[in-house]
């Protein structure tokens, strides 16, 4: 799975068109899973380029992994919500970008994990719809299929 993330971040490095060396350094750190070290530089870039979906996507990914690695539950929730806020902004700017949609599904799923059962069920329909669209757009991306597998598993755990 880590190899996939490294390849994903290398993909970002190849297709990014802004901020030259700064962005290259950030992508190198992301590919090395150094999320704490990229948070501040990304936030600085975001303040310069608030409408850049590539920066927002990277901020979302960074906060998602900070959430996943958090020891404190409050840090987990705070970073999960930030990840979702950033990806929502990116989605508003570039709603047809399959990588943004993929991370939208991931961060949405994370934010509803502790929600009410009713909301989990309602959001599971949204998650499935978007995940299927991502699979259609990125049919060779194995991570998309993993997302669907996780969705089915988490849905099976919901107790009414």
Language-model regions, residue ranges each:
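Conserved small/polar residues in nucleotide/adenosyl-binding loops
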Residues: 159-160
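"A position-specific structural signal for the A-helix of alpha-solenoid helical repeats
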Residues: 24, 58, 62-65, 103, ...
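Helix-turn-helix repeat elements of alpha-solenoid scaffolds
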Residues: 29-41, 76-85, 121-125
């Amino acid at each position: 799975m880590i190899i996939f993330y490294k390849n994903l971040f290398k993909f970002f490095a190849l297709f990014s068109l802004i901020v030259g060396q700064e962005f290259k350094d950030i992508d190198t750190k992301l590919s090395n899973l150094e999320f704490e070290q990229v948070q501040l530089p990304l936030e600085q870039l975001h303040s310069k380029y608030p409408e850049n979906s590539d920066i927002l996507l990277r901020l979302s990914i960074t906060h998602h992994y900070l959430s996943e690695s958090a020891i404190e539950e409050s840090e987990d929730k705070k970073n999960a919500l930030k990840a979702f806020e950033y990806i929502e902004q990116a989605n508003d700017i570039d709603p047809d970008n399959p990588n943004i949609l993929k991370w939208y599904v991931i961060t949405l799923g994370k934010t509803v994990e502790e929600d009410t059962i009713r909301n989990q069920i309602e959001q599971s329909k949204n998650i499935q719809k978007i995940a299927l669209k991502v699979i259609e757009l990125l049919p060779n991306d194995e991570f998309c299929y993993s997302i669907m597998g996780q969705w089915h598993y988490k849905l099976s755990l919901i107790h009414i």
